[in-house]
From Swiss-Prot:
Protein name (record): Claspin
Organism listed in the record: Mus musculus
Bilayer-crossing regions: none
Gene Ontology, cellular component aspect: Golgi apparatus; nucleoplasm; nucleus
Coiled-coil residue spans: 159-187, 599-626, 1001-1036
Sequence similarity: Belongs to the claspin family.
One Gene Ontology molecular-function label: DNA secondary structure binding
CKB motif repeat locations: 887-896, 917-926, 954-963
Length: 1315
């Protein structure tokens, strides 16, 4: 056994050499240089310095190791090994691996906590069996597995206690020390290996960035490096292990002394091996440095590729093609994710060596993601192998046991991870590992590693030759090399794995990587997300598409069964079932989409057409009324027609008047009855017209216009009811048939039209109440403001008067006539007074309406009658609307006897008297003219008017609301505004007050609508008349009193006229300012004209316009002078006188100018002026003026005839070429600066026919009328002789022959100018 031990020692020494070489070579193999600093290899040329600096530490540790804990390593004592030679190698490996793994425990416990040490050591031993042949794998066993293994080792130690404790304790102490040293060395290598790993891009491994304290345990280990002392410790450890194992195998053949000898011998050989290894390491290092320098490989960290900014924002590319630094964390996610990441092109070349060495590991079937650096992988494998050697050497059974325990420990401490699988795979694939190592040498891409291997082999062989054991040395060299290289990185791997596993157990997500940018979910955004409008619109559109809107329900009639409580004949109450037809209005779904494309437009157009028809109808009637008012002839015709119609109706009317107006008491009763009847008839008419009439006319408020064709508006005695019904039906039918057709003139038609329009059209729209104005003298009279509510103030006169407040006519009688003279336009619109079909104008009616829907009567009146005060629109509109001559007559006459009694009386009067009264009223002869202004409201009084004053009084009484209910109506009107134009609703309301029994519900509805409309209308009307005051006064005057209308007429008229004047006429200040403006303008024009004349007369030619170069050229033509300008503004005969005066003055100065020019020409021919004017300056103008003045005086002395002849001769001989020596050709280009001859020619050419139209500017020549031509001829003779005189001084080539000059009549061309 001693020989065996000696051989083992030799092997160990040789192995130590190899190990030292391997330790030095391992960095070179990876091509990465020193682990510690990541510096270029050139900086680490001598490892000797490191060894020297580290030796003292390691020696010190060896010296102190004797006194240190001894109770930990019982496991090596187990007598389980049979083959001593095998055990030697295994012990060598295990000793190294254990010694390398111990520093880990030292970091934690610092030699005091020895339990950690075996636990850390044991993983290595556990992994070793699988990696024993020197297989390199990139995975180490988890730190946690060591704990269980340590327990098994403790069990083994307990078994070995049979041995002498002292010896074992001593051996254990040395073993512990050696292990600690080895572990420190491993730590050093591991820390060195860590740094190249930093290139993997995993920031978690960068201790500068993440000082988590997880790797603090490594700090102490960094201080120690691989040194010869550690190698010696490993040798001692193996020797001691051998000693421990031999007693078990050979029944304790060895004694303690043998062990001491062995230790001495091994110490000697250690020193020798240390020297050799040192030299070998130096050689190897220098050689590897040379190879690295010469190699063409671009190391990824040594020659970095230039990077763009994008590369900095990307994750750092992994230095290897497979896996990343996160593989250390055993993260499946990272392994799968980063496995595919490619390395930068520059890195790929440097990876060759690493890939090849790692490729061998992959071929072994490890199945785990390899480490990023070949070095780390190799060192890990070495450590695992070394650690496992010991266990394997002890016993194969033990090895299986360790494997099982390791697996259990893994499953206990952390979830089963790829690392666990890798361990089992590594163990099972041990036999293949050496083969793979052989492949490494053959790899073409790995040029450096093979060379290094050759170096290693050479050194190994040398040392083997010295020791005399070449074979054993070779084997041990291979195993030891693997062990040393692998041991460098295994412990750090384990540490990382352990910390990662601990983190996972604590619930920390290890896969997360730190980055500069914030995560999407790292911020809590409190702002509401912005809505995507386009998306919402798309949703809405899709919703509309998916859910088509329901089609609107059409108008339909439904029969509703109701139960009514009736009083039977016997006085008992009975419940009866009745069926009531209810018309459901068409549903208006505004949002509803119409089935057809243009359906909505068509519906709107149809509605508009209907509304326009009604509007046109009303406007037609208004125009007719206006037309008739304007043409008083129409009144007479209408009156005749009305008489004819009235004859049939008047009897009934008189009866009704007697019946209604006999007394106030009877009147109220009758009114109630008639209201009911009227409502019935109106409702019937409304039905016939297919228009819903909310309420038939109310007798009072509607001015009783409906009463009958007689002006008892709307009061229909029961006897007359049938008649009125017929008329109404007829009129309504006609309206339906033809909007443009004339409406029936009967009051019934009036009623129907009123209902029709009122019900259909909002009250603010004027309704053509007068359906057939000509024929419906009654309706007009009776229904004077057929749509009282519809017409704002205009109806007020008629409507409000019917209510009683407005009993006073809205217009004074005088004004009523003038009122309509203003608008002659309507005449053209009407086919005839009798015809009320104004179809031609239907389309244009809208233009004639104002914003409120009324005719633009006001505008016409302003245009034509600016002088007259405007009548309040109320009266205008009412009259226009009603257009019933009856109403108009009543209004004009102002005879509104608010007393029904009076009304009855007038009807009794003869028709002739009525006709006379009507004529008188139309003609403006109002017997009751003072009172008449109050009367305008009684529009319906056409029939009554046809009767004598009494019928007029009746009509006035009815219209004026002399009925007891007038007070109530007044109150209502005041509420609604300043006035209620008998809006039909208002009228109804008043009737309702009187006849609340008849139609309470209908009236309420109508009143609501009317109130709104009336308020709007009243606001507008306030501008034109102070109606509130007027209504109050009127109410006091006409009230419900039945006094005679004459009592109040005068006062009312005066008050009304004053109001109108105040409203219409501008204030005195305004008038004064306007007059001043006009006066000043005329004065200024006159001054300018005179100034111009003076300038032309006294300034030299051209001086008038020689002010500056920028002057405007002004040409004065004969007929486009002041006279033409005056024409533009003065069209009246008064202006003609002014024009004549202007013409005279103009003729004079023209005459004078021509004379001056002639004289100047004569002087020029004599050459006097030519010489002078060249020398003359501005001052010499006085001389020229003096000459002109003298010449003018001489010419004036000549007879007037001579002057005229001369001037005319000049004009008539425009072609004389008189050249005044060119002196007068001024430099400026103005026309007036031309030579006088040219000016004369122009004047002659432009001599126009004065009789021609004044403003005809487009033609120059006018033929003279024959008489004027003759006159011209006559005057030409004297001119010829005269011509001779003047031409003698300045002969012209075209001189006329001098015929005997017969003195012609004194005629001047200026006569034409004047005309």
């Amino acid at each position: 056994m001693t020989g065996e031990v000696g051989s083992e020692v030799n092997l160990e020494v040789n192995d130590l050499k190899l190990l030292s070489q391997e330790a030095a070579d391992s960095p070179v193999d990876s091509g990465q240089g020193s682990f510690e600093t990541l510096e270029p290899l050139s900086e680490r040329d001598s490892d000797e310095e490191i060894f020297v600096s580290k030796k003292p530490k390691s020696r010190k540790v060896l010296q102190d190791s004797d006194s240190e804990a001894e109770d930990r390593d019982d496991a090596p004592e187990k007598p389980t090994y049979d083959d001593s030679a095998e055990d030697t190698q295994e012990n060598l490996h295990s000793g190294k691996s254990q010694s390398r793994s111990f520093p880990k425990a030292l970091a934690d416990s610092d030699e005091s906590d020895m339990e950690e040490t075996p636990s850390q050591e044991s993983p290595e031993t556990q992994e070793a069996p699988s990696l024993e042949p020197g297989h390199q794998t990139g995975h180490s066993v988890d730190f946690t597995t060591g704990r269980k293994l340590s327990k098994t080792l403790l069990r083994e130690g307990a078994e070995g206690k049979a041995k002498s404790k002292r010896r074992l304790e001593k051996e254990e102490r040395t073993m512990e020390k050696i292990r600690r040293l080895k572990k420190k060395e491993t730590r050093c290598e591991e820390s060195d290996a860590d740094r190249p790993l930093n290139d993997s891009g995993c920031l978690l491994e960068d201790s500068d960035l993440f000082e988590t304290g997880l790797e603090e345990e490594n700090d102490s280990a960094l201080e120690d490096e691989e040194s010869l002392e550690s190698i010696r410790a490993a040798v001692k450890n193996k020797v001691k292990n051998r000693k421990k194992k031999e007693p078990t195998l050979e029944s304790e053949a060895f004694s303690l002394e043998d062990g001491n000898e062995l230790s001495k011998g091994s110490a000697r050989k250690e020193r020798k091996a240390a020297r050799l290894s040192k030299e070998a390491l130096k050689k190897l290092h220098s050689e590897t440095q040379r190879l690295v320098r010469e190699s063409a490989l671009n190391l990824p960290y040594h020659m970095p590729e230039s990077k763009t900014i994008h590369d900095f924002f990307k994750r750092k590319p992994r230095p290897t093609c497979q896996g990343s630094a996160m593989a250390l964390l055993k993260s499946c996610k990272y392994q799968s994710g980063h496995y595919k990441e490619t390395v930068n092109p520059a890195d790929a070349a440097g990876m060759g060596a690493e890939d090849s060495s790692r490729g061998s590991e992959q071929r072994t079937g490890a199945g785990i993601a390899a480490e990023t650096n070949v070095l780390s992988e190799v060192s890990e494998e070495a450590g695992i192998t070394a650690g496992s050697d010991e266990a394997c050497g002890k016993d194969p059974v033990r090895r299986g046991e360790l494997e099982i325990e390791e697996t259990e420990k893994h499953s206990d401490d952390r979830p089963y991870s790829p690392g666990d699988r890798s361990m089992s795979q590594q163990e099972s694939s041990i036999p293949r590992i050496e083969d793979n190592e052989g492949h490494q040498a053959g790899d073409l891409t790995e040029s450096d590693p093979p060379a290094l291997e050759g170096e290693e082999l050479k050194t190994v062989e040398k040392t083997d030759a010295k020791e005399g054991m070449p074979e054993q040395k070779t084997q041990s060299a291979a195993a030891a090399a693997v062990a040393v290289v692998t041991a460098a990185a295994a412990p750090p791997e384990k540490v990382r794995r352990f910390t990662v596993d601990r983190l996972r157990q604590l619930g920390v997500d290890v896969s997360s990587q730190p980055r500069l940018g914030a995560d999407e979910d790292s911020f809590v955004i409190l702002d509401e997300p912005k809505t995507n409008r386009e998306l919402e619109a798309l949703k809405q559109r899709f919703w509309r598409h998916a859910n088509p809107a329901a089609s609107p329900r059409a108008c339909q009639t439904v029969n509703v069964n109701i139960i009514v409580k009736d009083l039977g004949t016997n006085g008992k109450e009975e419940l009866k079932a009745e069926v009531v037809p209810v018309t459901l209005a068409a549903e208006k779904l505004e949002g509803a989409s119409h089935a057809k494309p243009g359906e909505k437009l068509q519906m709107l157009k149809a509605k508009l057409q209907e509304a326009m028809k009604l509007r046109r109808l009303e406007e037609r009637q208004k125009r007719q009324a206006l037309f008739k008012l304007d043409n008083e002839d129409g009144f007479e015709e209408e009156e005749e027609e009305e008489e004819m119609t009235d004859e049939s109706e008047e009897d009934g009317e008189e009866e009704t008047t007697e019946y209604l107006l006999g007394s106030e008491d009877t009147e109220t009763k009758d009114e109630k009855e008639t209201d009911k009847e009227n409502t019935d008839t109106s409702s019937d008419i409304g039905k016939s017209v297919a228009l819903c009439v909310p309420k038939p006319l109310s007798s009072d408020s509607t001015l009783l216009l409906f009463k009958d064709s007689s002006s008892k508006m709307g009061y229909f005695p029961t006897e007359e009811k049938s008649e009125t019904d017929e008329y109404l039906a007829k009129q309504s039918d006609k309206l339906d048939e033809d909007d443009s057709s004339s409406l029936l003139t009967k009051e019934s038609s009036h009623n129907s039209s009123f209902e029709l329009i009122g019900s259909t059209i909002p009250s603010y729209q004027p309704c053509n109440r007068q359906i057939g104005r000509g024929a419906s003298f009654l309706p007009t009279a009776g229904f004077r403001s057929p749509s009282p509510g519809l017409f704002r103030g205009s109806l007020i006169s008629s409507a409000s008067k019917s209510s009683g407040k407005l009993s006073e006519p809205s217009l004074p009688v005088e004004d009523s006539q003038d009122l309509y003279t203003a608008s002659p336009e309507p005449k053209t619109l009407f086919l005839g007074a009798g015809d009320f079909q104004f179809c031609l104008e239907d389309d244009t009616q809208s233009q004639l309406l104002d914003a409120d829907g009324f005719l633009n009567i006001r505008n016409h009146r302003h245009r034509y009658q600016a002088v007259k005060p405007q009548l309040p629109l109320a009266s205008m509109d009412e009259n226009a609307m009603d257009a019933n001559m009856d109403e108009l007559l009543d209004l004009c006459t102002g005879q509104f006897t608010s007393q029904p009694e009076e009304k009855c009386q007038p009807r009794k009067n003869d028709k002739k008297e009525n006709m006379e009264e009507l004529l008188n009223l139309c003609s403006g002869k109002f017997p009751t003219q003072d009172a008449s202004p109050v009367a305008p409201l009684g529009l319906r009084s056409q029939e009554k008017e046809s009767s004598t004053e009494d019928p007029m009084e009746e009509a006035l009484a009815l219209c004026s609301g002399s009925f007891p209910t007038d007070r109530e109506e007044e109150g209502e009107e005041e509420e609604f505004g300043d006035f209620q134009l008998v809006s039909k609703e208002n009228g109804f309301a008043s009737d309702e007050d009187e006849h609340s029994d008849s139609n309470d519900e209908e009236l309420a509805l109508d009143l609501e609508d009317d109130e709104e409309e009336l308020l709007k209308q009243s606001e507008k009307m306030k501008r034109q008349m102070r109606l509130k005051k007027y209504l109050e006064d009127e109410a006091e005057v006409s009230g419900s009193d039945v006094g005679s209308e004459d009592e109040y007429d005068g006062e009312e008229i005066d008050e009304y006229e004053e109001d109108v004047i105040d409203e219409v006429l501008p204030s005195d200040e305004e008038l004064e300012s306007q007059i001043k403006k006009i006066h000043m303008k005329t004065m200024l024009d006159d001054d300018k004209r005179r100034l111009r004349l003076y300038q032309e007369r006294y300034l030299a030619d051209g001086d008038l316009h020689s002010d500056g170069p920028g002057r405007t050229r002004k040409f004065r033509w004969k007929h486009i002078d002041d006279t033409s300008q005056m024409d533009l503004f003065h069209r009246d005969s008064d202006d003609d006188q002014v024009e004549e005066q202007l013409d005279e003055t103009e003729a004079k100065w023209r005459k004078e100018r021509i004379e001056r020019e002639q004289w100047l020409r004569e002087q020029a021919q004599q050459g006097k002026i030519a010489a002078d004017e060249e020398d003359i300056g501005d001052d010499s103008q006085f001389m020229m003026l003096a000459k002109k003045v003298t010449a003018k005086a001489l010419q004036k002395n000549a007879s007037h005839t001579v002057v005229v002849q001369e001037s005319k001769s000049v004009l008539r001989n425009p072609f004389e070429t008189i050249r005044p020596g060119g002196a007068h050709q001024l430099k400026t280009g103005s026309l007036l600066n031309q030579p006088k001859a040219v000016l004369q020619k122009l004047a002659a050419l432009s001599d126009l026919n004065p009789s021609a139209p004044r403003n005809s500017r487009n033609f120059v020549f006018h033929t003279l009328s024959p008489t004027k031509a003759e006159a011209a001829k006559d005057s030409s003779k004297p001119q010829v002789r005269r011509r001779g005189l003047s031409s003698m001084m300045s002969p012209s080539p075209k001189r006329l022959k001098t015929n005997g000059s017969s003195p012609g009549p004194k005629r001047s061309i200026f006569r034409y100018l004047e005309s």
